[in-house]
Amino acid sequence: MRPSTTTLSLLVFLISSILLATTGKNSIIRYTYFPILLIICHLQLTNPPVNTASNIFDGSFEGTTLLNGLQQLNILVLTGVDVNDESGSSVFRRLKSALIYPFNARGVGTKYQIKNLPVLSSFICKEKQGESGLSSFLSSARYRFAIRQLAVSAWQYLLADIGFSLLKNIPTEKRLEYYGPEEEWMPQSLDQLRVRIEATLVFWVTLKAFAEIQSKIATALLTAVGVTSPHDWPPFFGSLREAYTLRGFWGKWWHQQLRWPLTSYSNFITRRVLKLTRSPLERYLNNALVFAQSGIVHVYFNWIKGVQDGDVGCMAFYISFVAGYFLEDHVQGLWRKAFDRTSAQESSLWLLERLVGALWVATFLTIVTPWWVYPFLRLSSSLKMPYSFVDVFGFQGALTVVFMGAAALRIGLNAEP
């Protein structure tokens, strides 16, 4: 009997943590672990997919196994993290530090911390003194953080429930008409264009909410019991106000969980193997390699979820952003040259630039998102949460709670859900 994907993931985590705590940066033992890691990853990749008929969370853990393997290899070999530099000589302290890295994909609080991390809300960071009762409880940044995380995650669960309900509750004949094979590439009518715009908007709003739920619950619990502090967990996503360019969309607004491992591999290829100097060629090749790796990770998730015809569209979606970056960079360069200013200078036309930029990003996403998403939308059975409040209270009732909840979170907890 073959070990489960979960068992293999725990094995990778355990071995990697022990090696990280007990070996140095250039230890030969780390390199001998590489073929073992490849074998384990092969077993994970060739395990049969889980049953996809239950809900959207099924397979989520298995879907991260490939990324986890890539991150372990990055930490041990490519980046070569040495916890002796950070934790002194105590084996216990080195092991504690080593256990953090597999869960710290953004390198928070280390010298490997990625760029453009969002900052914690002032609601969490501000000090409150001399209060009693509930106010005294809330004077602790730790508990304010936990309460805020749990409250926002509950709101996001309901929002994701609404989004998946909108995508799921479509008659079969309409589903095939709108999302059928080959429909993802180009709309053939105004009605299909309308559906394309609606599906893209609902998908990204829903995915953003869904992607944060498990993280917020886990970080709330870890912080509430004192294992971590709020400063260990900068916001998972940045501000939507930064998403007026494609680079801002991926580099400042969207989550950065893949950034460190994937850029480590792309930099290894471009700078250490190909010996490229910093140049436009090196930059765009790095972009292409990062998006190609991201595409492969998400194709694996497709397989886990039982999506049989989405591999080409998924890869095309991610690779398309290289062309988008190229076009965006050159148009911005021409614009700055026309107004004789550097990229660091603030333009008097900043509002126009952001409006045009937001329209550009929305248009690009509307074109390419269905390439990736429509094969998922053809599988209505998995487009649901473990428990649907929409099925119980109705769409209008759930939507009312979402709007009221958003206002309450903003006013009471200074949250931007």
Curated annotation (Swiss-Prot):
Entry membrane topology: Multi-pass membrane protein
Record-given protein name: Acetyltransferase nanB
Leader peptide range in chain numbering: 1-24
A Gene Ontology cellular-component term: membrane
Gene Ontology annotations of biological process type: lipid metabolic process
Enzyme Commission number(s) from the entry: 2.3.1.-
PANTHER family given in the database record: LONG-CHAIN-ALCOHOL O-FATTY-ACYLTRANSFERASE 3-RELATED (PTHR31595), WAX SYNTHASE DOMAIN-CONTAINING PROTEIN-RELATED (PTHR31595:SF27)
InterPro entries: Wax_synthase, Wax_synthase_dom
Pfam family, one: MBOAT_2
Metabolic or biological pathway: Secondary metabolite biosynthesis
Transmembrane annotation, as ranges: 150-170, 284-304, 307-327, 356-376, 389-409
Family note: Belongs to the wax synthase family.
Protein purpose: Acetyltransferase; part of the gene cluster that mediates the biosynthesis of the benzazepine alkaloid nanangelenin A which contains an unprecedented 3,4-dihydro-1-benzazepine-2,5-dione-N-prenyl-N-acetoxy-anthranilamide scaffold. The first step of nanangelenin biosynthesis is catalyzed by the indoleamine 2,3-dioxygenase nanC which produces N-formyl-kynurenine through the catabolism of tryptophan. The two-module NRPS nanA then utilizes anthranilate (Ant) and L-kynurenine (L-Kyn) to assemble the dipeptide product nanangelenin B.
A GO molecular function held by the record: O-acyltransferase activity
Subcellular location: Membrane
Keywords: Acyltransferase, Membrane, Signal, Transferase, Transmembrane, Transmembrane helix
Top-level enzyme category: transferase
